[in-house]
Amino acid sequence: MADLLFEIGAEEIPAGFVPGALRQLEDDLSKALADARLAHGEVRSVGTPRRLAVWARDVAPKQTDARTEAFGPPVAQAYDAEGKPTPAATGFARSQGVEVSALVRAQTPKGERVAVTKVEKGRRAEQVLPALLERLVGGLRFRKAMRSRFDEATFARPVRWMVALLGGRPLKVRHGEVTSGKVTYGHRFLAPKAIALKGTPDDYLAKLRRAHVLADPVERRAALLAELARAGKEAAGKVRDDPALVEQVLYLVEEPTAVVGEFEKSNLELPPEVVISEMRNHQRYFAVVDGKGRLKNRFVAVSATRVKDPAVARHGYERVLRARLADARFFFEEDRKRRLHERIEDLGRRTFQAKLGSELDRAQRIGAVASALARALGKDALVADLLEASRLAKVDLNTGMVGEFPELQGTMGAHYARLEGLKPEIADAIEDHYKPIGAAEELPRSDLGALVAVADRLHSLVGIIGVGEKATGAADPFGLRRSAIGILRIVIARGYHLSLAAAVEQTLDALSGVKLAAGRAVVAEQVLDFLRGRVRAAWTERFDADLVEAVLAAGSDDVVDARRRLEALADAKARPDFGSLAVAFKRVANIQEKAGGSGAAAVDPALLRDAAEKDLLAALEKVEQEVVARRAARDYPAVLRTVATLEPAVARFFDGVLVMAEDPALRANRLGLMRRVAALFSDLADFRKIQAEAPAQARAG
């Protein structure tokens, strides 16, 4: 057994490319070794902006032999009456590269056939690995790649060296004009000389560590966090928590060195989000806060190298930030010269989407939709504020500050609203209507912000789909999936019992002046189908797919209600008696579907002949009122517990009663009894879609 080590050295790879490339290297090498029939131990990747490396421990010295079996014609066609090979047999043997005498008889599902077994002897690992590694590096995919001037080889950035070692012995691997060897290189400035490697992962990491390169991202992250903690204390505060920035900076440096800098206190008069955005998004600096979380006029930059005089680096970082903050102050002061209400008409000169009109059109429609949603929820008192918040929600798009810092849309509008003395709730709604930005981001804080946020997303979703634009595959230029997920997250989190169909219709009303690419009913169904797809995708990440399908089939117009039904059903499925219950109710639903008809039905007690059907009716009458009451209260766990008490009576009914009796009156009465049972659970879930079976003892009984 020997360790395989493979490193690709390159010019600085963009930080966002590195984590994905490392995952791909690890996954692809594992699969390639398996496909090559080379046994191995741990596969792991490490990397920095200048190198991507992967290793496999304990690689077998040679491939395992491959045994393959090929089947030919039936024996009856392969040999004549005297047992001599026919042309069919000789032709098959020739196609397999063997003598006809090598053919054997083999039983197959299609009868006895001639066959040939071939064994491919495994080659030595050093013979297999060079081509395997060339495919590995050539198969790496990046959002953008560069091509060499001299050949077709591509990579994120120009490849400068490669290392390929098996048990310390070099393998010859080529990528473009670069051929692998056994030397790597340390830090570009602190240890640029070549470093000879022994080929083990431990030797690789240790030698690079001495050369000022922490190749392992886990080790480098720990060093980065330690540097940030040290620098925070030096700055008489602490570095503001920012996991996303830590992850980004992690792949910008090979050995992190923190530098504390300072900016003028007067810049703290700017909204803190402006200062933080300038530091983190434009300069990759970490903000420093005091014990109460308030921004200090200090920052921490992470240098990719160590310098003899830290003051030189500090002054450089401060100079860049000083200029950027001066620009921010200028935009802030200029923006304050006009009130938000004075900017509303400016939205008419800003296009939202060519077929959907201006941002002013958009703002007016958002207000109409938000008001309709509020009335549907019985929140009429919010309508005036909703209209005001909707008018102002997009106004900051025309400010200088948002023009310079697009990531602060909504945030700056909220700041300006507060400075102008507008209602705090309206200011919060202006900021919150962009939330959630991502799948795990925070949600709007109030009904006001939540309803404007939902209305904004509904307008985008219905409008964009309505004019014929759709999300296809990986392409979603208008963020339709994000809009749909945002709607669902807000509605469920706030417990809004909204009809999605009605909400879509209300949005189409607001879009009445827009020319739709299809009929109104067609557009409405396209939007609802898109929303249902997002519901299905989101819920199947957490719940069993069959339960999700069962619940959605019973109704998904009110997603809050559907989610509660799903959670109750998932809890019920975890109980040992669920299999029997699901099987019984599935049978009830199947009978009802075949017989036609739905809903509750009258049952004539006088036509009940068997004890089992009389018992079932008695059991039904005991629970029907309770189920109706529990269902009205949306207490679905209680509904399922109550309905579950019917399972023994339903099982006995099916064991002893013929539902489809020859007597039409008996048959109709028994089908009515089935409809009465189905009426108790059919609006909870379609049990026919649930994958379940009764316990073995129940089936045996």
Curated annotation (Swiss-Prot):
Q: Where in the cell is it found?
A: Cytoplasm
Q: Which GO terms describe its cellular component?
A: cytosol
Question: Which top EC class is given?
Answer: ligase
> Which PROSITE patterns does the entry link to?
AA_TRNA_LIGASE_II_GLYAB
Any idea of its EC number?
6.1.1.14
Any one Gene Ontology molecular-function term assigned to this protein's record: glycine-tRNA ligase activity
Q: Which InterPro entries match?
A: DALR_anticod-bd, Gly-tRNA-synth_bsu, Gly-tRNA-synth_heterodimer
Pfam families documented for this protein: DALR_1, tRNA_synt_2f
Key words, A-Z: Aminoacyl-tRNA synthetase, ATP-binding, Cytoplasm, Ligase, Nucleotide-binding, Protein biosynthesis
Task: Supply one GO BP term.
Answer: glycyl-tRNA aminoacylation
> What is this enzyme's catalytic activity, as reactions?
tRNA(Gly) + glycine + ATP = glycyl-tRNA(Gly) + AMP + diphosphate
- Please give the HAMAP family that the UniProt record associates with this protein: Gly_tRNA_synth_beta (MF_00255)
The family line of this record is: Belongs to the class-II aminoacyl-tRNA synthetase family.
Cite the PANTHER family for this sequence: GLYCINE--TRNA LIGASE, CHLOROPLASTIC_MITOCHONDRIAL 2, GLYCYL-TRNA SYNTHETASE
How does this chain assemble? Tetramer of two alpha and two beta subunits.
Q: What is this protein called?
A: Glycine--tRNA ligase beta subunit
Biological source species = Anaeromyxobacter dehalogenans (strain 2CP-1 / ATCC BAA-258)
